[in-house]
Amino acid sequence: MVLSSEASSAADHSAAAPIPTSSWPQLLGRLTEGKHLEPGQAGWAMEQIMSGNARPAQVAAFAVAMKMKVPTAGEVGELADVMLAYARPMPADLIRDDTVDIVGTGGDGVNTVNLSTMASIVVAAAGVPVVKHGNRAASSLAGGADTLEALGVRIDLGPDQVARSLNEIGIGFCFAPQFHPSYRQASVVRREIGVPTVFNLLGPLTNPARPRAGLIGCAFADLAEIMAGVFATRGSSVLVVHGDDGLDELTTTTTSTIWRVQAGTVDKLTFDPGDFGFARAELSQLLGGDPQANAAEARAVLGGAAGPVRDAVVLNAAGAIVAHAGLSSRAEWLPAWQDGLQRAAVAIDSGAAEQLLARWVRFSQHV
């Protein structure tokens, strides 16, 4: 299964320094020259954006220039830390310390069905607590929030309600605009410029529930290791994944590259789902539609329908269960995958996933 392996340490990424005095001309000048920012400068820029002191042109220039330069893990970590500091806080006493998130950067341009959304429900039904962070579609026809809404889940719950959902149902959804109101200006700019930027990396890194484990999809192969580096500095157990067909998911059309984050280190692996008996799918078999179409697909898969979409959902759900198992230093790679795949399949075939969705819908509508 593992064709190649490379390791790096979170210690390679220096901690962010106090935010220095800076200016947009100084900062943008460095970026357009291809130079890394000084420690604290990325944090300064994000502080300007989140506080509403940055103009739209400055936000757009920064977002694009940072991605073109290729950010460091330290720079992205500063952006995420400032964004989290502005987020609506979750009730810490009600949030378990072993939650998992399943989310991607978006931006792969493929418009697949909402695999991570379906996988989240399966993982929760398998007994792993899930706090999913997500938003409406930015470039595809339906984002995770759009599909959940079409399924009947109320997506605009606040911190206390999400915490209750997690504790009573086993899953909660943090709708990004509800928890990151100060990010509104950057969201508008991101939609207007219409191309992936450094901001695509921030969604998976800024879940306000701060889950310690996750299956994190990255559509950008050159940036996935940077995301993994940020998670490593946090001591997370995460699989950052990039389908070698370009998907920000574990794919079944070919191999995937995985950056496994555990105990502060990052290992790069090549993962072949065929090693676990998965048939190769065609990308066209994983394509989605509008929210109603994706919701119908989700109901079918959670109801037990076989086929390429189910395979991809089971694979991604298993990946999240593997990441969750990584919170224990005793977790072993192959046994964890075997366990995760079995638990994901049973969660669907037993009806547990379908039943959990029904309970979640009822809870969210009456909380």
Swiss-Prot record:
Chain sites annotated for binding Mg(2+) 1: 116, 249
UniProt GO cellular component terms: cytosol
Protein residues bound to anthranilate 1: 104, 135
Keyword Acyltransferase listed: no
Cofactor(s) this protein requires: Mg(2+)
EC number per UniProt: 2.4.2.18
Reaction(s) catalysed (UniProt annotation): N-(5-phospho-beta-D-ribosyl)anthranilate + diphosphate = 5-phospho-alpha-D-ribose 1-diphosphate + anthranilate
Transmembrane segments: none
InterPro entries: Anthranilate_Pribosyl_Tfrase, Glycosyl_Trfase_fam3, Glycosyl_Trfase_fam3_N_dom, Glycosyl_Trfase_fam3_N_dom_sf, Nuc_phospho_transferase
Annotated residues for binding of anthranilate 2: 190
A biological process term (GO) from this entry: L-tryptophan biosynthetic process
Record: residues binding 5-phospho-alpha-D-ribose 1-diphosphate: 104, 107-108, 112, 114-117, 132-140, 144
Region described as Disordered: 1-22
Pathway: Amino-acid biosynthesis; L-tryptophan biosynthesis; L-tryptophan from chorismate: step 2/5
Low complexity: bias regions: 1-17
Binding-site residues, Mg(2+) 2: 248-249
A matching Pfam family: Glycos_trans_3N
One GO MF term: anthranilate phosphoribosyltransferase activity
UniProt KW Chaperone keyword: no
Family matches, as PANTHER family: ANTHRANILATE PHOSPHORIBOSYLTRANSFERASE
Similarity section: Belongs to the anthranilate phosphoribosyltransferase family.
Subunit structure: Homodimer.
Function (record text): Catalyzes the transfer of the phosphoribosyl group of 5-phosphorylribose-1-pyrophosphate (PRPP) to anthranilate to yield N-(5'-phosphoribosyl)-anthranilate (PRA).
This protein's name: Anthranilate phosphoribosyltransferase
Organism this protein belongs to: Mycobacterium marinum (strain ATCC BAA-535 / M)
Lineage start: Bacteria, Bacillati, Actinomycetota, Actinomycetes, Mycobacteriales
GN (gene name): trpD
